[in-house]
């Protein structure tokens, strides 16, 4: 079965439809994997979320930071940012059905031998460990304690993974790695201040995927999140955030043969240091 991995949508529903038309013209009913940030900043977050909900028999998603932010805003833990475009979801008659489905999605998944995440994987983690740690977060997010989990989710510390981490600190570190990571120090300490392109790392930092002895180096990691990185294709990496909401492109890559399909996107937001 053919599978396409698709980059950050961020509420760009029109471009999603155009991309799916191109995919279906080549491989009708191909399996789909979306690497998170389904909603927010684009003009049609509700339509995008509803469309993926309708595709759930052929599509899988991992949660991104904007998707988690939607859940936090919806339950009153966070105020919307001035650039957020979530009002249509918050006012929708089917919001609870959509949000319940959303919080039952994983932060990491395996598809055809690929590890799919939104942002990155810490160098200390193997593919199986990343999936297991994602499962810890998923268990809480899908439980009756999900609001309390979201309340403790925000923050940049602990910035370095330790197997002995417990409670909210442990879950926060997992979430930050899988949904926010770009740069790390050589010892695996996460940096959340820098969002620039990977070829210009600050002193003492490297893109997470260039760290030596990364335990997922023998697997192919598929991710999004890093729009200034653009399309990245290496034997063991697929970076798919090509800046759709910023006036770039929406990208799909066939996981079997790496055929690439793209659609151009109008600029809905101006890039900032925290996109």
From Swiss-Prot:
Enzymatic class: hydrolase
SUPFAM superfamilies: Metallo-dependent phosphatases
Keywords: Hydrolase
GO molecular function annotation: bis(5'-nucleosyl)-tetraphosphatase (symmetrical) activity
Catalytic reaction(s) noted: P(1),P(4)-bis(5'-adenosyl) tetraphosphate + H2O = 2 ADP + 2 H(+)
Pfam families listed in its UniProt record: Metallophos (PF00149)
InterPro entries in alphabetical order: ApaH, Calcineurin-like_PHP_ApaH, Metallo-depent_PP-like
Superkingdom assignment: Bacteria
EC number of the protein: 3.6.1.41
Family, similarity comment: Belongs to the Ap4A hydrolase family.
Function, in words: Hydrolyzes diadenosine 5',5'''-P1,P4-tetraphosphate to yield ADP.
Protein name as it appears in the record: Bis(5'-nucleosyl)-tetraphosphatase, symmetrical
This protein's encoding gene: apaH
